[in-house]
Structures are given as structure tokens and as C-alpha cells.
């Protein structure tokens, strides 16, 4: 689930040609190299210079389409050259689509994705296995994005198309390596990355059966099958998508002990990065005792800690992990195979893990109200309960909600959508206030003791 830098626009170069006969000066503009334009667009996108990135990609796509049309009309051009141009254009269209979706233009994004997939219809003509694999991998990426933009069976069809292409891509890359035709670390890395993509695609299918397609007759079996295939591809060094998705399924099946083990294993994959990030906001294991520990002096990540933090899964994924950890903590008492001591230990393991994950999210973005609320829930779920820390985070989330409500009430709330949003804020305020009231009762009990 799931955080700004700038790049200057490119300048057109001018070439001056002087005529010896009349002394006239003719200015001619040399067109920018499209590869350079695309490189600049990539950098702009990576540094969140969205407007410039979209302009550069749009310029590149327009000119690549012109080149493709010329190449189609030129019978001398080779199929390999044409395929390379199509691949380049499809990737540019895909990047444009990503940007448009990110700024709310879902229709434009979907159109660009569709145009890109249409370019890659059919099979690559080249006999080179690497070229064939690149073709299929590019098309798979587009369908994975389309799956995220659509719902129900449309999304399922997109994911299944991507899965088919990724499986073919793996066969091509593996065959090339096994035959000894190619000995290249880049190809080996591409094979590993493609397997990870396939693992993620299976997880996306499973997620569909847990949500949009949950009422399908075969939903549970289809979800289980997809996740078993994902786990076969799971790499202990990669993101724990499959483990977390399986934990979610096991919770829905009331198989709580399995879910507990799965989500803790998933957390162990990201623990180092989460702890490093949580330490930035005073939520490391040794600093989480007091609520005021969040007010610590600025710290900076370095070395292994920085690398671990940079490799963390996205914001939404970690937020979901924290919720699963808290849910498992609340269900430990239902696991009959654990004795009382083990139940307390496992519960606190889940709670502490959730605090570290939420701390990493708070360090990334401290303006998400839900993270403050969930931290309050985590500290109040500990055994023994950390009421002081829980109160600190609940009070901050309450203040943020009240500020949002005040801003909304200052605007126009005549339409149904605004009224619904305001009602949701009121419900959340009530929920947080109830949590604080319960903490007040706990404080009174402690004083009596």
C-alpha cells in the first residue's frame, strides 16, 4: 500500500549555418535525441517532477509514433528495428498511463495502457529468446497495471493474461541460460525478477478472490491455488507478498495459528528496515516505553539500515501488515494449542511488530491519521497495556480528525458526497473518543491498585 526533487527541462540546441555568397544566417533546430528525452523523463518521474515527466513522455510518444509510421512504410527496415521501436513506444505509453492514473486521469491512463497493449499483440518476430522474453515481459507489465485499474472478471482476465506471458518469459530466459547460449548476470537477474513478478501476479489474483470475486462459487479454492503457486515462487530475500496474502486467507478461514505464523514470518522479512525507520520517530524497541519518545532529535539512516529501509514494501502493503498483526494479536487467545505463557508471548510479539511497522509508516508520512490511531490501538493491546503511549497517539489522531472536520465545515457540504465524508469523520471521532474513555477507566483502576 504506501512519499521531492526537480529536474530542469531540456534545451533545444541550435546550429548556425552561414552562407558565403549572401552572408545570410539560417537557424535550424536539431531535434532532441529521443533516447535522451526518455532518459530525462525517467529521471523526472523518479524525482517526482510529474508535470515535466508527462510532457517529456508525451513528446517522445508523439515522435516515436511518427518514426513507427515511417518505418512501416519503409520496406527496407528490418523486423528487429521495428520491434525495438514498438517496445520503446509501448514502455513510454505505459509510463504516461501510470502518471495519468496517479493524478486522477483514470480514463486517459486506461486508454494509454490499451494503446500500449495493442502495440504488443501477437508474438515477437525475432528468433532471439531474449528479445521474445522482453516482448512478453513488457506486455505482462501492461496487463498487470490494467488489472489494477479494473474490477472483477476484467481484472482477473488481465492478471491471467499477464501470468501467461510471465510464465512464457521464464521459460525463454531459463532455456537460454540452460542451453549455454547466454551466460549473463543481467539475464540471470531478469529471470529472478520475472519470477518475483509472477509471484506478485498470483497474489493479485488471490486478492481478487478475497474481495471483488469473494462470492464466486470457487473463490476459496481459486484463492488457495493462486497462493500455493505464489509460495512456490517465493524468494526469502524478496518482499513477503505471498506470506502476507496467505495469512489474510488463513484469517478468513479461522485458521488463526497458521495466520499468526505466516504474518510473523512476513514481518521478519521487513523487520530490519521497519526498525530502522521506526527509530527515526522514537519507536525502536528500546525507546518505545514512553509516549514522549516520539520527540527525539533528528536521526539519519546509514549503511545497512539505509539499504534495508529503501527496500521496504510500499506504504499500503505495510499498513495492511500492521492491521494483520493487530488482528492476530487479538485472536491469540483462541489458539488452544498454546499455553497461557506462549499466548502472552505471541500476542506481544505481534503487538511489538505492528508498532515497528507503524513506526516506519509514521517516519515516512506523519500526516496519515489512521497510522496514529493504529499506534494507539497497538499500545493499548500490549500485555501489560501501555496506556500512556496509547493515549498520546489517540489524542493526536483525535486532534487531527477534529481539524479535518473544522476545515470541511468551513467549505460547502451541501452535496451528498461531502455529507457522507463528514459523517464518516464524526464516526471516527466517536470511535477514538471511546478508546480514550476506556483508557481513562484503566488509569482509574491502576490508581486504585
What are these regions (language model features)?
Residues 49, 255-435, 446-449:
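Structured C-terminal portions of repeat-based eukaryotic scaffold domains
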Residues 39-40, 88, 95, 138-141, ...:
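"A position-specific structural signal for the A-helix of alpha-solenoid helical repeats
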Residues 26, 64-89, 117-137, 166-198, ...:
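Flexible helix-coil transition and linker loops at the boundaries of alpha-helical arrays
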Residues 47, 96, 103, 149, ...:
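Structural motif corresponding to the intra-repeat A-B loop/turn of tetratricopeptide repeats
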Residues 44, 93, 100, 143, ...:
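Residue at a conserved register position within TPR or TPR-like alpha-solenoid repeats
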Residues 33, 53, 82, 89, ...:
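Residues that mark the junctions of alpha-helical repeat units in TPR/alpha-solenoid scaffolds
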Residues 51, 107, 153, 157, ...:
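Residue register within tetratricopeptide repeats
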Residues 32-66, 102, 152, 203-214, ...:
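Alpha-helical segment of the N-proximal tetratricopeptide repeat
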Amino acid at each position: 500500500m504506501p512519499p521531492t526533487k526537480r529536474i530542469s527541462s531540456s534545451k533545444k540546441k541550435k546550429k548556425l549555418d552561414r552562407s558565403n555568397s549572401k552572408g545570410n544566417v539560417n537557424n535550424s533546430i536539431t531535434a532532441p535525441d529521443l533516447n535522451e528525452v526518455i532518459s530525462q523523463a525517467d529521471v523526472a518521474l523518479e524525482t517526482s517532477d510529474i508535470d515535466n515527466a508527462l510532457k517529456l513522455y508525451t513528446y517522445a510518444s508523439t515522435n516515436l509514433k511518427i518514426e513507427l509510421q515511417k518505418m512501416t512504410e519503409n520496406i527496407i527496415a528490418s523486423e528487429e528495428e521495428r520491434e525495438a521501436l514498438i517496445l520503446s513506444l509501448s514502455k513510454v505509453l505505459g509510463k504516461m498511463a501510470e502518471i495519468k492514473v496517479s493524478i486522477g486521469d483514470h480514463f486517459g491512463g486506461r486508454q494509454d495502457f490499451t494503446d500500449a497493449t495493442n502495440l504488443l499483440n501477437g508474438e515477437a518476430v525475432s528468433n532471439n529468446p531474449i528479445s521474445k522474453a522482453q516482448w512478453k515481459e513488457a506486455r505482462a507489465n501492461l496487463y498487470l497495471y490494467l488489472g489494477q485499474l479494473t474490477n472483477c472478471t476484467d481484472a482477473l482476465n488481465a492478471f491471467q493474461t499477464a501470468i501467461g506471458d510471465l510464465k512464457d518469459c521464464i521459460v525463454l530466459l531459463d532455456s537460454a541460460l540452460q542451453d549455454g547460449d547466454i551466460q549473463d548476470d543481467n539475464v540471470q537477474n531478469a529471470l529472478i525478477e520475472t519470477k518475483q513478478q509472477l509471484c506478485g501476479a498470483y497474489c493479485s489474483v488471490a486478492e481478487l478472490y478475497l474481495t471483488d470475486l469473494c462470492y464466486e462459487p470457487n473463490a476459496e479454492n481459486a484463492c488457495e491455488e493462486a497462493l500455493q503457486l505464489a509460495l512456490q515462487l517465493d524468494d526469502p530475500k524478496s518482499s513477503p507478498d505471498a506470506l502476507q496474502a496467505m495469512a489474510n486467507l488463513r484469517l478468513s478461514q479461522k485458521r488463526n495459528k497458521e495466520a499468526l505464523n505466516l504474518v510473523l514470518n512476513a514481518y521478519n522479512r521487513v523487520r530490519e528496515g521497519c526498525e530502522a525507520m521506526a527509530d527515526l520517530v522514537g519507536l525502536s524497541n528500546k525507546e518505545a516505553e514512553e509516549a514522549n519518545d516520539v520527540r527525539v532529535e533528528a536521526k539519519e539512516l546509514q549503511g545497512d539500515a539505509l539499504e534495508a529501509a529503501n527496500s521496504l514494501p510500499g506504504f499500503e502493503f505495510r499498513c495492511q501488515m500492521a492491521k494483520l498483526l493487530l488482528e492476530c494479536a487479538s485472536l491469540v487467545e483462541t489458539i488452544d494449542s498454546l499455553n497461557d505463557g506462549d499466548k502472552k508471548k505471541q500476542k506481544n510479539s505481534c503487538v511489538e511488530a505492528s508498532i515497528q511497522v507503524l513506526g516506519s509508516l509514521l517516519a515516512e508520512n506523519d500526516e496519515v491519521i489512521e497510522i496514529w490511531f493504529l499506534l494507539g490501538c497497538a499500545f493499548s493491546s500490549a500485555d501489560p497495556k501501555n496506556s500512556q503511549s496509547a493515549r498520546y497517539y489517540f489524542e493526536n489522531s483525535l486532534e487531527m480528525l477534529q481539524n479535518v472536520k473544522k476545515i470541511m465545515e468551513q467549505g460547502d457540504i451541501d452535496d451528498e458526497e461531502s455529507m457522507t465524508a463528514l459523517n464518516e469523520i464524526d464516526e471516527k471521532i466517536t470511535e477514538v473518543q471511546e478508546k480514550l474513555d476506556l483508557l481513562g477507566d484503566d488509569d482509574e483502576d491502576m490508581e486504585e491498585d
